[in-house]
């Protein structure tokens, strides 16, 4: 799964064009990109047919009503060229929108073929014309990254249509549009409604965004209990930013019973996910022995992990400086430069 960008925005789904990174949501494609390859001889890459573009890739969800879908199964097994053949065949023969999206994903990422953003976009547009929410969302993300005001206005329309079609990622991004007030009028109450729609589908970033609105009383009545509940759910579905904030809430007893041990466990959970703030706070907990047994070497290791992500803490710098050379070496040995967290 591609890394999710922490904070207000989400990373585009696995096949989305790279220029739109700030406005999209995570998908479940594999992290490693296979080597680009030429298309099978049966498929002429980029050549349109009367039914639409000639190439396509698989969606990360199997088409409804097909159990199992051969193209999706091949995609999941890493047989990308086979998935492409099957998706293209079905898209051209039956006008199947899900197969079109799969084709677009493969072309956009270069799975099984050389990357072809133009052909990928053609497939997204063909699927969007059929009302496919994933295609509408991706096109919205592409347009939102444009400098053109007209394109951004169209992006809002695509997000809306995708959200109304059931895309939780689109609902989240539409909420951002109304929360920020840069593309559409700033309307926190409307933003909250779209975040709620995304949260109903357990979209992690929508849950977190809605929690912050309840925390601040922005567009909704201020409600620390509801904010904590939403943070808890966002944490459960993998949002490390929400887990970090939930840990702070639990440590302070805001909207939930104060529980330093639970807070320490939550900080550790987010720290292991690579969240620099959680790494810093967990280091402080270990250095003070509040909520977890005092462990200055572990505290130093977590501090160094956070510091590697440009999060400084003079107090913990002093802790590291106070260690013996042997202790510092032990702490440093637990932090590998390519790892998001100390190796325990």
Question: What is the meaning of each model-derived region?
Answer:
Residues 2-14:
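Bacterial N-terminal signal peptides that target proteins for export
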Residues 67-74, 86, 90, 102-109, ...:
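Hydrophobic face of amphipathic alpha-helices that form TPR/SEL1-like repeat modules
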Residues 51-55, 293-294, 307-344:
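Terminal, low-structured helical/coil segments at or just beyond the last alpha-helical repeat
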Residues 85-88, 125, 160, 196, ...:
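Alpha-solenoid helical repeat scaffolds
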Residues 27-94, 98-101, 105, 344:
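N-terminal leader/linker segments that initiate helical-solenoid repeat arrays
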Residues 78-82, 114-123, 147-158, 185-194, ...:
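Structural signature of tandem alpha-helical TPR/SEL1-like repeats
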Residues 62-63, 67, 75, 79, ...:
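Short helix-capping/linker turns of helical repeat alpha-solenoids
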Residues 13-22:
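Bacterial N-terminal signal peptides
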């Amino acid at each position: 799964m591609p890394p999710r960008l922490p904070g207000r925005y989400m990373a585009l789904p696995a096949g989305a064009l790279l220029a739109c990174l700030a406005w999209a949501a995570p998908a479940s494609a594999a992290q490693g990109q296979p080597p680009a390859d030429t298309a099978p001889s049966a498929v002429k890459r980029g050549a349109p047919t009367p039914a639409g573009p000639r190439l396509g890739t698989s969606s990360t969800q199997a088409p409804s009503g097909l159990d199992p879908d051969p193209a999706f199964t091949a995609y999941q097994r890493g047989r990308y060229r086979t998935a492409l053949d099957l998706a293209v065949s079905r898209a051209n023969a039956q006008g199947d929108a899900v197969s079109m999206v799969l084709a677009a994903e493969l072309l956009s990422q270069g799975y099984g073929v050389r990357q072809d953003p133009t052909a990928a976009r053609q497939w997204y547009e063909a699927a969007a014309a059929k009302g496919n929410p994933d295609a509408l969302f991706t096109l919205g993300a592409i347009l939102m990254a444009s400098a053109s005001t007209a394109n951004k206005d169209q992006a809002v329309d695509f997000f809306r249509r995708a959200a109304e079609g059931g895309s939780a990622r689109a609902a989240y991004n539409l909420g951002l549009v109304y929360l920020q007030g840069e593309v559409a009028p700033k309307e926190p109450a409307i933003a909250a409604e779209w975040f709620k729609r995304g949260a109903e589908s357990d979209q992690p970033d929508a849950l977190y965004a809605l929690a912050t609105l309840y925390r601040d009383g922005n567009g909704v009545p201020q409600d620390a209990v509801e904010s904590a509940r939403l943070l808890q759910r966002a944490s459960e579905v993998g949002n490390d930013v929400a887990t970090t904030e939930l840990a702070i809430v639990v440590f302070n007893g805001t909207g939930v019973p104060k529980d330093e041990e639970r807070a320490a466990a939550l900080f550790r959970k987010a720290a292991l996910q690579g969240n620099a703030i959680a790494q810093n706070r967990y280091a402080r907990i270990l250095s003070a022995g509040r909520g977890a047994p005092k462990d200055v070497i572990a505290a130093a290791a977590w501090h160094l992990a956070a510091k590697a992500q440009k999060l400084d803490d003079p107090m913990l710098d002093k802790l590291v400086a106070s260690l013996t050379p042997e202790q510092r070496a032990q702490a440093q040995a637990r932090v590998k430069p390519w790892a998001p967290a100390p190796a325990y």
